[in-house]
Amino acid sequence: MRKIIVGSRKSKLALTQTNWFIDQLKALGLPYEFEVKEIVTKGDVILDVTLSKVGGKGLFVKEIEHALLTKEIDMAVHSMKDMPAVLPEGLMIGCTPKRVDPRDAFISKSGASFKELAEGAILGTSSLRRSAQLLAARPDLQVKWIRGNIDTRLRKLKEEDYDAIILATAGLQRMGWDNEVITEHLDETLCVPAVGQGALAIECREDDKDLLQLLAHINDAVTEKTVAAERVFLHKLEGGCQVPIAGYATITENDAIELTALVGSMDGSVLLKETVVGTDPEKVGLEAADRLIKQGAKELILAANKGQQ
C-alpha cells in the first residue's frame, strides 16, 4: 500500500482544507494511506507588512513546492488564489475539486451592511483587489491593512479600530463559521473575486502518473475549465498580489465560459472591466487580457508596481 505524503500550511484553514481533501480520496476506498506534513511558508512568517510589499507571487507556496520537487511530499493542497500563474518546471495542478462560494464576505462590527457603513468608516483588508473595488463604490471609506489568519482578523475586528473587514466566503464556509460571522456576501458585480477564489489547487509532480490517476477521480471539469480561463488571463497580464486584478468565470446555459476580468488603479479611481464569452478557456482568458490592455491595463499595472517599490 502506497503512503502519500500531503504538504500543507500550518494554519487552521489550510489543515481543514487538506484533511477535507484527504477524506475525499479515502472515500474512494483505494489502497492508499495518507500523512500530512505541515510546512511554514514565507507568507506565514512575514505578518507585519502587506502581501504586495513583499512581492506577493507564490508567498504561500514556494516552500511547499520545494518540498514537492525534492520529494519530501507527494502532493500539496493549496487555495487556488495563492497559486502563481506559472508553476515550477516538473510540477502541475493535478486536480481542481469543485469550487465553493467565490464571493467576498463583508463582516461589520455593528452589523451594518456595506452600503450602511458610516461615512469615513475603517475597512480592514490586505487585498489591493478588494480595496480598489470597494473604494470605487465608496470613496469615503478608509482602508486599513490587516494581516493574519481568519481567527486573527476576526479578533482584530472586535478589539481594534476596524468598522468592518473583508474575508473570502470560502474560507469561512470551510471552517463552518459563515452563518455565524458574515454580515453580507458582496455581489460579484460590486467586487469581482480573485482569480481562483473558492477553488482548491492540488499540486503534484508531472511524472507521478499513479497519483494523477487517483486525483482524476476528484477533479471537477467545470471548476477546471473556469479557473483555467481566469489563470490564463492572470498570466497574460502578469498580475500578482501587487496589482488590483480580478477574474471570475462561470459556465453559461449554453455551456460557454463567461469571464469577467478587471484591473484597477490602487485607489479605485479607475476600474477597467471586460466580460468575454467563449468555449475555449485559453482563448477566453487571452481575449479578456487583450481587451483590458487596449483600455490601458498595462499602464495601471506599471503604476501599481512603481507604487509598491
From Swiss-Prot:
Q: Which UniProt keywords apply?
A: Porphyrin biosynthesis, Transferase
Q: Which PROSITE patterns match?
A: PORPHOBILINOGEN_DEAM
According to UniProt, the reaction catalysed is:
4 porphobilinogen + H2O = hydroxymethylbilane + 4 NH4(+)
Tell me the Gene Ontology biological-process terms attached to this UniProt entry.
Answer: protoporphyrinogen IX biosynthetic process
Instruction: Cite the cofactor comment.
Output: Binds 1 dipyrromethane group covalently.
Q: What does this protein do?
A: Tetrapolymerization of the monopyrrole PBG into the hydroxymethylbilane pre-uroporphyrinogen in several discrete steps.
Recite the other comments.
The porphobilinogen subunits are added to the dipyrromethane group.
Q: What is this protein called?
A: Porphobilinogen deaminase
